Amino acid sequence: MTLEELKIRQLTNQYLLAPADKLTVMRDLCGVQAQFMTNALHSLKIRTNDYDEQTVAEGLVKNWSVRGTVHVFAESDLPLFIRCNNGADYRKNEWQGYSYMKNQRPCWALTPERQKYLADIIISAVAERAYTRDELKELCRANGMTKIEEDCMFESWGGGIRELCVRGFMNYTVQEKKQYIASPEFSPIPEEEAKFEIARRYFTNIAP
């Protein structure tokens, strides 16, 4: 196989020469990175044959995913990417032990009790409707959140908000603005099974 043939195969496998429907593309490519939504939507648009700006968000979610970054991916893949410590932490609003953000931030100021209290406020809110990040901040402030607690709960690398996302409580809405909505219920896939499936998709559609 020549170098040019390899290039063509790679472009085809990534749906750049042979577009497919939105959900097929999203599943096979393990979603698209969504640090900047404009780029994510462009990446999807050039690979799909059913792209529609009015309905593009249907069937998709936005959450923390591969490489510890925010991706847009198929809602049906929530169990694959949001594995919640092999399901042990799925919708678990208890923070006495290890948590990713707390153990990454030496200055973490939220006690387990206060984190649970603020999380309850946020979970109840997004169960009713979508809330922006600023709206959630105002809601928590109105319920007694201090500045130092806010710096943890809404920390720029995700904070307590991220922990609620990766424990299956909520997702970002699929748009540029930082807005959150309750996640549909799902059953996380066991860690090893999920990693195998992600690797299978990667080596089928992305890797050389």
Mark where each language-model region is:
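Phosphate-backbone binding and catalysis cores of DNA-processing enzymes
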Residues: M1-D151
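Loop-centered beta-sheet repeat module
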Residues: E150-P208
